[in-house]
């Protein structure tokens, strides 16, 4: 999914925007199987515990971990990614148990984007203070990492403590990649030290200045990574891919959605790759064309220029 100086392409779910009718999600798992066969690098799911009409976005509706477990059984190669799990809302043991279970069932394909949360309604619903989310995020990430270590553990955290017990199952490859989303209330230096990768919004996508500003942000982060080690950067965009391949990149809904033809999209992906982006997660739920048609065009005309790296999962998935 990630390699230095290379960009891969993934797909954000849902493939059709939920607006009160669950029927729009019918057949989505079949299309995810198609995404897997077509060679996309990843499928991404959101973590939206409550639908807040003021946000107007319910994500893929389903619980992210339950749904990824279902999709693990419908796919063989594609990475299964959260974008992003709000780890400040839930206990680290429960999060880690769900994550490592999916990682084992999928043969090591889980990539975990993590976030502190940005919807104020969720925190009092969980009995938590919205203002504490940054601190809880940092504690939760540390706790989860400790849980995945080998052997009997001794953990003493503001979020809980125990001694002399082992956490199971362990991740397939010894750890699950934890990609910090945005700032999550942390400094850039903290993200450089503690994150396995960084997922950020892309800035403007219809002009050259957006990728230029993104490149500056990525360079500033990478300059702070201890030892200069490679860590991937990811970004995303919601697109309305039109039939005309020459249609110019045009922002819609205040820049939330990009209407574009294939050539404009490829130019954007090339600019992102030059900026240091290693993975682009595209959301197609606002496209006017059928999802299957958009996926076919992306697979036929875009993926050959941004191929997935084809790494075999570290182990065979469990036999369901």
Predicted region positions:
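Active-site-adjacent structural elements that line small-molecule/cofactor binding pockets in enzymes
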Residues: 1-320
């Amino acid at each position: 999914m990630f390699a230095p100086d290379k960009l891969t392409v993934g797909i954000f779910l849902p493939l059709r925007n939920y607006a009160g009718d669950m029927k729009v999600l019918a057949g989505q798992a079949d299309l995810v199987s198609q995404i897997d066969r077509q060679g996309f690098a990843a499928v991404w799911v959101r973590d939206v515990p409550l639908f807040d009409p003021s946000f107007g976005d319910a994500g893929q509706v389903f619980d992210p971990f339950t749904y990824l477990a279902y999709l693990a059984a419908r796919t063989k190669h594609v990475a299964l990614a959260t974008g992003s799990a709000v780890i400040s809302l839930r206990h680290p043991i429960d999060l880690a148990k769900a994550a490592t279970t999916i990682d084992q069932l999928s043969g090591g394909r889980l990539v975990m984007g993590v976030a502190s949360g940005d919807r104020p309604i969720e925190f009092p619903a969980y009995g938590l203070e919205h203002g504490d989310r940054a601190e809880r995020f940092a504690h939760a990430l540390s706790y989860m990492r400790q849980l995945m270590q080998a052997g009997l553990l001794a953990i003493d955290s503001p979020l809980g403590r125990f001694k002399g017990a082992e956490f199971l199952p362990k991740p397939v490859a010894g750890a699950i990649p934890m990609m910090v989303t945005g700032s999550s209330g942390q400094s850039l230096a903290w993200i450089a030290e503690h994150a396995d990768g960084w997922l950020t919004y892309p800035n403007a996508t219809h002009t050259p200045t957006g990728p230029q500003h993104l490149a500056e942000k990525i360079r500033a982060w990478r300059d702070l990574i201890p030892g200069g080690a490679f860590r991937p950067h990811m970004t995303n965009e919601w697109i309305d891919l039109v039939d005309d391949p020459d249609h110019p990149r045009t922002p819609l809904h205040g820049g939330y959605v990009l209407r574009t033809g294939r050539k404009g999209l490829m130019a954007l992906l090339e600019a992102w790759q030059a900026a240091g982006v290693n993975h682009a997660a595209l959301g197609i739920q606002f496209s006017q064309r059928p999802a299957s048609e958009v996926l076919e065009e992306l697979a036929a005309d875009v993926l050959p220029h941004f191929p997935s790296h084809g790494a075999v999962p570290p182990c065979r998935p469990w036999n369901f």
